[in-house]
Amino acid sequence: MINIRKTHPLMKIINHSFIDLPTPSNISAWWNFGSLLGMCLIIQILTGLFLAMHYTSDTLTAFSSVAHICRDVNHGWLLRNLHANGASMFFMCLFLHVGRGIYYGSYLYKETWNIGVILLLTVMATAFVGYVLPWGQMSFWGATVITNLLSAIPYIGTTLAEWIWGGFAVDKATLTRFFAFHFILPFIITALVVVHLLFLHETGSNNPSGINPDSDKIPFHPYYTIKDALGFMLLLLTLLILALFSPDSLGDPDNFSPANPLNTPPHIKPEWYFLFAYAILRSIPNKLGGVLALLASILILLIIPLLHTSNQRSMMFRPISQTLFWILTANLITLTWIGGQPVEQPFIIIGQLASVLYFLLILVLMPLAGLFENYMLKPKW
């Protein structure tokens, strides 16, 4: 009997992607985050769809509609808490996934890496427009501050900002279009994920050692399906604990007040997952310079493959590069902390030093470390 999973046109694609896929036998738990991100995306789309059924994108009723979801809709409070905290889990997995890619040299699969960076930017855009929708104080002022950055672009800046706003300030037109963007972007993300996987399966997965794993591969199912299932359970457990016991711990208290254009909150700050970029933006005292640094802080990921100087792919056997990688990690945590602090000393100078160190590590120190490690490994006799 012919196996349908190997002959049916649709089943064949699923089979080659998730069942009979040859996978390196030594990939660690750091390779779980791809599937966890897929799960996060599914959770966000499903909870978001049900929230959209009850939400109204009008400045007069948006805030009330979110309150109505939490109070009057069956399990609406759960949907909202899962969606809000699901975004945090999504970004946590994203940062760990990108970090894994940098540590183990996965960025040398250039197409997969570049699509991944585009995915990161798209997810960030989705999260930003989504944060505006509840129309609380921080939603409104966050939208005002970030969209205002467009006006720093020479010549066309002001026109561009007003075009995004649909008026002369953030108002009803802005909220309506942001809701439209927030609804469509996850489906664009899903399409990009398919392309991301398509390019990944052209080359096969990297592995911790960074050497060609073709001589030692095992089928994805059952070995990695069961491993992913464990990851799913741990992620769901973490998300449920967060959403059920401490749903507002990652949010801003200002967002429990309806948006008021006449009253500016004392400290305008985005959600925690944008704070590192916000700190880099604030550390430059020039508006256009700050915007360029903000863009560079994310787009720098695109040139990481060009900065690879080592003869080894992975950092597994490169202690100097490992040290610099963990300094970079600590630096990003420092930037995240600074982004949430008021603009005053000593936070200003710490933020500026951390911003300089961020670019210095990626552009100069890590490539130099790779060259030095190559030199140290050369036979000296």
From Swiss-Prot:
SUPFAM superfamilies: a domain/subunit of cytochrome bc1 complex (Ubiquinol-cytochrome c reductase), Transmembrane di-heme cytochromes. The cytochrome bc1 complex contains 11 subunits: 3 respiratory subunits (MT-CYB, CYC1 and UQCRFS1), 2 core proteins (UQCRC1 and UQCRC2) and 6 low-molecular weight proteins (UQCRH/QCR6, UQCRB/QCR7, UQCRQ/QCR8, UQCR10/QCR9, UQCR11/QCR10 and a cleavage product of UQCRFS1). This cytochrome bc1 complex then forms a dimer. Disulfide bonds: none annotated. Its main location: mitochondrion. It is a multi-pass membrane protein. It is found in: Mitochondrion inner membrane. The gene is MT-CYB. The keyword Iron-sulfur does not apply. Pfam families: Cytochrom_B_C, Cytochrome_B. CDD domains: cytochrome_b_C (cd00290), Cytochrome_b_N (cd00284). It comes from Sarcophilus harrisii. Binds 2 heme b groups non-covalently. One of its GO terms (molecular function) is metal ion binding. This is Cytochrome b. One of its GO terms (biological process) is mitochondrial electron transport, ubiquinol to cytochrome c.
